[in-house]
Amino acid sequence: MKEVYLDNSATTMAYRSVGELVQKVMCEDYGNPSSMHNKGVEAEKYIKEAKETFARLWKVQEKEVYFTSGGTESDNMALIGAARANKRAGNHLITSSIEHPAIINTMRFLEEEEGFRVT
């Protein structure tokens, strides 16, 4: 029987070429991209190339591209940033009860700690 995987919004199989590159980076080019030694310089090249690629695809500037550790951190950054940036326009935020916990918890934070009204 052929497997049909329907949870791709949570985890999707990587292309083989992506998996091979990730393995190479993690096993060979694993330097700290913030360091000035050779491994760090090589690691920084991967980040720079990725930023250039994403910026070109999304038609934005490289300085507008941020990499995070995952979806929850991205949700937090986007929601908190947008809420704070637009607070002068009003402090009412609207969400739904079926949102991912990362969204619900961030909305709760904005309500309890930053004074937003959430419905």
Predicted region positions:
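Pyridoxal 5′-phosphate
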Residues: M1-T119
